[in-house]
Amino acid sequence: MAKKITALIKLALPASKATPAPPVGPALGQHGVNIAAFCKEYNARTNDKAGLIIPVEISVYEDRSYTFVLKTPPASVLLANAAKIKKGSSNPNTVSVGSITKTQLEEIANIKLPDLNTTKISSAMKIVEGTARNMGISILD
């Protein structure tokens, strides 16, 4: 019989920089998970993605064991890296803070495709383009 899940924890952590300090420690500690083991395993699995924020979904079971699934980085982080900006525009309708090309947009859409609710790259590009527009990033042809 399968183990029963007692908790589902969602965190967004910097790749290969998870520590037992908040927010990881309190989130996992209240469910009795070995925090140090999780941090070590997370850091090992995200070692190649340094500099990005990687969301993780942790399933905690009755016997206090856990499994976790790494998601793709948020589109806003990927767009900010591509446009070489620190953050989006505070007034995206009037102030443009950067720009990316259609090729960069397609690359980001390909990265995000597994986590989006679509299977077509054209639809994924529209989703990511909407995020870019809301950040004040313009798309160049």
From Swiss-Prot:
A cellular component annotation (GO) from this entry: chloroplast
Primary location group: plastid
User: Which InterPro entries does its entry note?
Assistant: Ribosomal_uL11 (IPR000911), Ribosomal_uL11_bac-typ (IPR006519), Ribosomal_uL11_C (IPR020783), Ribosomal_uL11_C_sf (IPR036769), Ribosomal_uL11_CS (IPR020785), Ribosomal_uL11_N (IPR020784), Ribosomal_uL11_N_sf (IPR036796)
Its BP terms in the Gene Ontology are: translation
As one GO molecular function, the record gives: structural constituent of ribosome
Q: Where in the cell is it found?
A: Plastid, Chloroplast
Cross-referenced SMART domains, in alphabetical order?
RL11 (SM00649)
Q: Summarize the subunit comment.
A: Part of the ribosomal stalk of the 50S ribosomal subunit. Interacts with L10 and the large rRNA to form the base of the stalk. L10 forms an elongated spine to which L12 dimers bind in a sequential fashion forming a multimeric L10(L12)X complex.
Function noted in UniProt: Forms part of the ribosomal stalk which helps the ribosome interact with GTP-bound translation factors.
* Protein name per Swiss-Prot or TrEMBL: Large ribosomal subunit protein uL11c
* Protein source organism: Phaeodactylum tricornutum (strain CCAP 1055/1)
Q: What is the lineage of its organism?
A: Eukaryota, Sar, Stramenopiles, Ochrophyta, Bacillariophyta
Q: Which gene encodes it?
A: rpl11
